[in-house]
Regions:
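Short edge beta-strands and adjacent turn/loop segments
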Residues: 14-30
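Charged, amphipathic alpha-helical segments and their flanking helix caps
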Residues: 43-44, 48-53
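C-terminal structural segments of small proteins and small subunits
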Residues: 51-79
Length: 79
């Protein structure tokens, strides 16, 4: 079974993040990801970066992953 912790681990191993949190119920998950890697990228490009960290899990194991992606500067303005 997929857990929020396993998704968080996949993302953390695949990209440098300043903040990362994942919650979910085993089928539907929500992630908040803050990374400098998102600078200059649009929302689709940011999501593609995260999907790359998940590999085949997005097609085979995870039904839905909702993401909020921010640069560190954007994240600071959200607080």
């Amino acid at each position: 079974m997929v857990t929020p912790e396993s998704i968080q681990l996949n993302i953390a191993q695949g990209m440098v993040t300043e903040h990362l949190s994942v919650v979910g119920d085993g089928a539907h998950f929500e992630a908040v990801i803050v990374s400098e890697a998102f600078a200059g990228k649009n929302r689709v490009q940011r999501h593609q970066l995260v999907y790359q960290t998940m590999g085949d899990r997005m097609r085979e194991e995870i039904h839905a992953l909702s993401m909020k992606t921010y640069t560190p500067q954007e994240w600071q303005s959200q607080k």
